[in-house]
Every structure is written in C-alpha cells, then in structure tokens.
Regions:
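Acidic/His-rich, divalent-metal-binding segments that scaffold phosphate/diphosphate chemistry
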Residues: 2-50, 65
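Feature representing long, continuous alpha-helical segments
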Residues: 3, 32-39, 51-59, 72, ...
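Short, well-ordered loop/turn and helix-capping segments at boundaries between secondary-structure elements
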Residues: 7, 43, 59-66, 80-88, ...
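Composition- and surface-driven signal marking solvent-exposed, interaction-prone regions
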Residues: 14-19, 47-52, 70-76, 89-92, ...
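A structural signal for short secondary-structure junctions
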Residues: 28-29, 55, 108-112
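Acidic/histidine-rich catalytic neighborhood
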Residues: 62-63, 67-119
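Regulatory modules associated with amino-acid/nitrogen control
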Residues: 97, 101-195
Length: 195
C-alpha cells in the first residue's frame, strides 16, 4: 500500500491525474502513510480487523505524540477503510440517499480525500488484477458526488454527466457514419460507464 501511495505521489499523473493532485495537496501526508501501515494490522487477531486496527493505530499515534485530531483521523481511516469500496460496488451511487449517508459518515472533504486515496491504494496493493477502470470509475464517482454534497454544490445526476461526455465525444467526430456507429455502441452501456 505504501509503495503505491509513494508512486501515486511522484508518478501516475497521467493514469491517476485526480489522485496525483489530491495526494500532493494533503495537509499531512504522514496521516495517509500511517493509515496505510495500520489498515490491515488487525487481520488474524480474531474479530473485526478494522476495529482492532483502529484501536491499535489510535494507541500508537498517541504514544508517538501525534495530536488527538491526527490520531483520531488515522484511527477513523483504519476503521472505515473498506467502506468506500463496499458502497461504490454494492450500493446505487446514483441514489441521493446513498450519497447523503456516505457524506454523513465522512463528515468533511479532508476525510473524504484521505479515505479515497487509502481505498484506491489498498485495492491496488491487495490484488492488482482486481483493479480495473470500472472499479476506479465507481470509486471516483462516489468521491466526486460525495465531495459535491459536502461542499453543498448541486449534485449533477449521472445521466446528465453521461450525456455531456457523450456529446463531447460526438463533437470530436467528423463523419456521420462514425457518429451512427458510436451511437449504437453507446446504447450497449448504461450511464455509469460514461461517468
């Protein structure tokens, strides 16, 4: 996980442009690294590994003299490190109630940024073969929709985002036959594919 975080911080500004920008804007990168170190520490100890890891990370962070706020954030990240992946893949992220509930969990955009980056790097480290554009898209959509909610911005429906992107693609094509062919392909996919 740490290796992926470091690489995302230095490289990957093409494949992970948004994430590269986010990781380099974090107020305290060490919080992300410590959450990455502790997120699976509770595995094999009997019980919920997220809860065990959260308690362990909180104790450690206090012991090394981190502020209570930083210690709480690390512990919260460890406790919730599976939430974003689970919600993005198992719930309907186009449902405003899903976004509202997740926004209540994360509370603010800073926590959201940290959790999003931890989630992506955890999935990529666990099994790189499981990481794909579809999962990335779901996570990114959940992130962007939740960020809009937390910033009190109007949340654009996925259908509207999808239509805008399709129109941009159509505008770049020259021939009518290309547009017709592409239109038939677009009908094979739901709106979430284009968001």
């Amino acid at each position: 996980v740490i290796k992926n975080m470091r690489r995302m911080q230095i490289h990957f500004d093409n494949e992970f442009k948004l994430e590269h920008e986010l990781i380099n804007r974090l107020p305290k990168i060490e919080i992300l690294y410590l959450a990455g170190l502790f997120h699976d520490l509770g595995k094999g100890k009997g019980g919920n590994h997220s809860e065990i890891g959260a308690a362990t990370s909180l104790s450690f962070a206090k012991r090394i003299g981190l502020s209570l706020g930083d210690a709480d954030l690390i512990s919260w990240l460890v406790l919730n490190h599976l939430q974003m992946s689970s919600i993005s893949q198992k719930k309907d992220i186009s449902d405003s109630q899903t976004i509202n509930s997740f926004a209540e969990l994360v509370i603010d955009t800073e926590r959201l940024d940290y959790l999003y980056l931890l989630t992506i790097n955890d999935i990529r480290a666990t099994n790189p073969a499981l990481w794909n554009g579809w999962k990335h898209g779901l996570l990114r959509d959940l992130f962007l929709l939740t960020r809009s909610k937390l910033n009190k911005e109007p949340i654009k429906p996925l259908k509207e985002i999808s239509m805008h992107r399709k129109n941009n693609i159509f505008a770049s094509l020259k021939g009518v036959s290309e547009k017709e062919l592409l239109k038939s392909y677009f009908e094979l996919f739901d709106d979430s594919y284009f968001t």
